[in-house]
Amino acid sequence: MRVGIGYDVHKLVENRKLILGGVEIQYSKGLLGHSDADVLVHAIIDSILGAAGLGDIGKLFPDSDNKYKGISSLKLLKEVNALIKDKGYKIGNIDSTIIAQKPKISPYIEDIKKSLCNVLDIDLGSINIKATTEEGLGFTGRGEGISSQSICLLI
């Protein structure tokens, strides 16, 4: 068994879609990034890569490479899942938290879980997604960005 943690943050800006866990969230702003800027998937990817000892998302999918510009983070997650399977690992479980003052994430949690389970080929009981605010504190509390944390157990 191996455990890895992941963290990601992106700035909220106008004229971008807000994608979390591969699901479009209805909101007036979206996250700025080289890819679709899906902070949840990026944190999950880093937790998986960390558990497998394979570096991090920036090493594997550098933002200096134009082939990743605008890419769906779910495609990156699928590639990471294939990498760990090739090394003989499978996901035991994933637990993640999305930190955002707005929008309200809880109505989307089940769709997010289904999206991630579909890509990772795991059952719904193997993933947990939570959402919280920072009670108006810090950059997420001021609505300037969204962050996410994740932990993954590989078996």
Swiss-Prot record:
Q: Cite the entry's keywords alphabetically.
A: Isoprene biosynthesis, Lyase, Metal-binding
Positions with a binding annotation for a divalent metal cation: D8, H10, H42
The pathway noted for it is: Isoprenoid biosynthesis; isopentenyl diphosphate biosynthesis via DXP pathway; isopentenyl diphosphate from 1-deoxy-D-xylulose 5-phosphate: step 4/6
Free-text comment on the cofactor: Binds 1 divalent metal cation per subunit.
Name the chemical reaction catalysed here: 4-CDP-2-C-methyl-D-erythritol 2-phosphate = 2-C-methyl-D-erythritol 2,4-cyclic diphosphate + CMP
Q: Which GO terms describe its molecular function?
A: 2-C-methyl-D-erythritol 2,4-cyclodiphosphate synthase activity; metal ion binding
Task: Locate the site labelled Transition state stabilizer.
Answer: H34, T133
Xref: InterPro entries: MECDP_synthase, MECDP_synthase_CS, MECDP_synthase_sf
Q: Name one Pfam family in it.
A: YgbB
One of its GO biological process terms is: terpenoid biosynthetic process
Under Enzyme Commission nomenclature, its number is 4.6.1.12
Which cysteines bridge via disulfide bonds?
A: none
- Which residues participate in 4-CDP-2-C-methyl-D-erythritol 2-phosphate binding? 8-10, 34-35, 56-58, 61-65, 132-135, 139, 142
Does the keyword field hold Lipid metabolism?
A: no
Q: What are the names of the required cofactors?
A: a divalent metal cation
Protein purpose:
Involved in the biosynthesis of isopentenyl diphosphate (IPP) and dimethylallyl diphosphate (DMAPP), two major building blocks of isoprenoid compounds. Catalyzes the conversion of 4-diphosphocytidyl-2-C-methyl-D-erythritol 2-phosphate (CDP-ME2P) to 2-C-methyl-D-erythritol 2,4-cyclodiphosphate (ME-CPP) with a corresponding release of cytidine 5-monophosphate (CMP).
Q: Which family does it belong to?
A: Belongs to the IspF family.
The subunit structure is: Homotrimer.
Q: Which NCBIfam families match?
A: ispF (TIGR00151)
Entries under PANTHER family matching the protein: 2-C-METHYL-D-ERYTHRITOL 2,4-CYCLODIPHOSPHATE SYNTHASE, CHLOROPLASTIC
Q: What is this protein called?
A: 2-C-methyl-D-erythritol 2,4-cyclodiphosphate synthase
